Amino acid sequence: MNDLIIQNIKELILPKSTERPLKGKELGELNITENGTVVVKNGKIVYAGEHSDAYEATETIDATDKVVSPALVEAHTHLVHGGSREHEMSLKRQGVSYLEILEQGGGILSTVEATRKATEEALFKKAEKNLLTMMEHGVLAVESKSGYGLDKENELKQLRVSNRLAEKYNLDMKHTFLGPHAVPKDAESNQDFLQEMIDLLPEVKAYADFADIFCETGVFTVEESKKYMEAAKALGFDVKIHADEIDPLGGLELAIDENAISADHLVASSTEGKEKLKNSDTVAVLLPGTTFYLGKESYADARGMLDNDGAIAIATDFNPGSCVTNNLQLVMSIAALKLKLSPNEIWNAVTVNAAKAIDIDAGTINQGDKANIVIWDAPNHEYIPYHYGINHAEKVIKDGKVLIDNRIKLEQ
């Protein structure tokens, strides 16, 4: 006997399962089955496709007039951090740039101070609350970065919290060491601090899957980033890079040359960098919510990347300074409006391609897959990015069991 049947599905979203990320025109190819059925046994997908009455189960969910998709994949977050920075909103309104705020001791450095002061338990409780909000909005696979410690003790503290959250919720979660996220005030020099973070790599290997670095004006150069990435790769890390967020330094080109699993931000990436995506499986993780929150007008050139047969994913960049949202659905709407992505492209970018960007087995509903599914209170897949700012996730199903039922919460 099967455990669960989801029947009468108005639209069943079935992203392609591929070894590599979807690139170029492939991103717009999305299998949508009308009047679909999903069957689950022992936490795994038994069947997903056209309507079928051939199966029996102990529980049946009627998804009439609903959309069913894989659970969303959140490919870029700064989940574990102390404090908040709401006071910076007025500075941004006055036109003060992010780098200027950073130079004044704000930005990342103010979060570093708050994170260092916070106990591990305080960080855990804060991160747990934000993680649960992500899950309520349909996310069941998450990448979580450190980067607000900037020293051994506090970077490890953040990574321990991230690992504890994954264990508590048995969650598909990847952990990223972002030690070189900024240069602390007490550093002798950028180069000395970078070497300190390189020396820390062997110790964080037990807690982190990826090594990441912020390659940007005033932080780390392309040459410094290359040194760090190659040291991390030599220890067995997959590497990522925050690149070309503000200036076109060549971070995207470096990511491709170093075979990084992803390059993130890419607002200012060069034409040459975008052209290099054609022959690379490095995923361009675009963060339009950050551009929106910072009030900037220039967004990452998603269409140009796709025209060059690049692979892109969409994520929130949830953090306390430049994108204070853990609602990936909202960022899907921003991606439609500002990145000019189609609904099909967006769905692939937050499921299968996001999973490739963090090397995790998620984002599809195929026979044998984990039954991590969302039932959406929406008439079709286009409606979710269209009706922005609210939570359309009605039921979040993890390993074949209803983990979150937002409809029950509303009725209560």
UniProtKB/Swiss-Prot annotation:
Cofactor entry: Zn(2+); Fe(3+)
Catalytic activity: 4-imidazolone-5-propanoate + H2O = N-formimidoyl-L-glutamate
Top-level taxon of origin: Bacteria
Cofactor note: Binds 1 zinc or iron ion per subunit.
Enzyme Commission number(s) of this protein: 3.5.2.7
Annotated binding of Zn(2+), by residue: 76, 78, 242, 317
Transmembrane segments: none
Entry binding sites for 4-imidazolone-5-propanoate: 85, 148, 181, 245, 322
Assigned GO CC terms: cytoplasm
Pathway: Amino-acid degradation; L-histidine degradation into L-glutamate; N-formimidoyl-L-glutamate from L-histidine: step 3/3
GO biological process: L-histidine catabolic process to glutamate and formamide; L-histidine catabolic process to glutamate and formate
Alphabetized Pfam families for the sequence: Amidohydro_1
Molecular function (Gene Ontology), one example: zinc ion binding
Primary residence: cytoplasm
Keyword entries, A-Z: Cytoplasm, Histidine metabolism, Hydrolase, Iron, Metal-binding, Zinc
Cellular location(s): Cytoplasm
Top EC class for this record: hydrolase
Positions bound to Fe(3+): 76, 78, 242, 317
HAMAP family (UniProt xref): HutI
Function comment: Catalyzes the hydrolytic cleavage of the carbon-nitrogen bond in imidazolone-5-propanoate to yield N-formimidoyl-L-glutamate. It is the third step in the universal histidine degradation pathway.
Family to which the UniProt record says this protein belongs: Belongs to the metallo-dependent hydrolases superfamily. HutI family.
Protein name, UniProt field: Imidazolonepropionase
Species in which this protein is naturally found: Staphylococcus saprophyticus subsp. saprophyticus (strain ATCC 15305 / DSM 20229 / NCIMB 8711 / NCTC 7292 / S-41)
Organism lineage string: Bacteria, Bacillati, Bacillota, Bacilli, Bacillales
Gene responsible for this protein: hutI
